[in-house]
Amino acid sequence: MGMVITIDGPAASGKSSVSRELARRLGWQWVSTGAFYRGLAFAALQLQIDLDDVSTLASLTHDPVWSVKMDDERTRVFFKDQDVTDQIAHEDVGNFASKVSHYPEVRKALLDAQRNCSAGPQGLVAEGRDCGTVVFPTAEAKVYLTANSEHRAARRAAELGLDHEDMVKAQQQRDLQDSTRKVAPMAVPEDALVVDTTALNLNQVVDAVVEYVKNKI
């Protein structure tokens, strides 16, 4: 495997946009590890599997009824051979995904799948909430993106067409769940480059990350 760069951070901090553009500039592979949890959550919701049915959820991680595939533009999720990538962005899917991520049995199964993502000869850009701390703890370069909660809520509300105040509350709850879960809580990786994206545009953030990566190569 080539070099691995991890990009972590809370929801709507800019992880996906930055990771995708960074991978494009470098000519590397890009994977969103969160897509695995959202894909599982979407499948569970479609199959009406109860959130508390841990054994069935763990078994579903290996069920071919859903799958994750990477291409040059995004990490795609398929359910019954249909591309549902846009649908997994919905808040109900994200909330379900955050809750099932607390289960060690589910995390272990999906962790194996995430680590099996193939990197090209140059490298892999891996984006998520625990890439630098859990999925790829020995990655050569680690980045943590953050932004104030109001700014993140505004981004997410505009993206999904939802009420801003409702989104603020939803994201605060999601951040609490992700940062306090007993298994692999969201945290800033040791020695990571921390970038506050609140007042920066996409190119400014990517430029900063590229300079950081150059010093690691």
Curated annotation (Swiss-Prot):
The keyword Kinase applies. GO terms for molecular function: ATP binding; CMP kinase activity; dCMP kinase activity. Gene3D superfamilies: P-loop containing nucleotide triphosphate hydrolases. It catalyses: CMP + ATP = CDP + ADP; dCMP + ATP = dCDP + ADP. Its EC number is 2.7.4.25. Disulfide bonds: none annotated. This is Cytidylate kinase. It comes from Bdellovibrio bacteriovorus (strain ATCC 15356 / DSM 50701 / NCIMB 9529 / HD100). The lineage of its organism: Bacteria, Pseudomonadati, Bdellovibrionota, Bdellovibrionia, Bdellovibrionales. The gene is cmk.
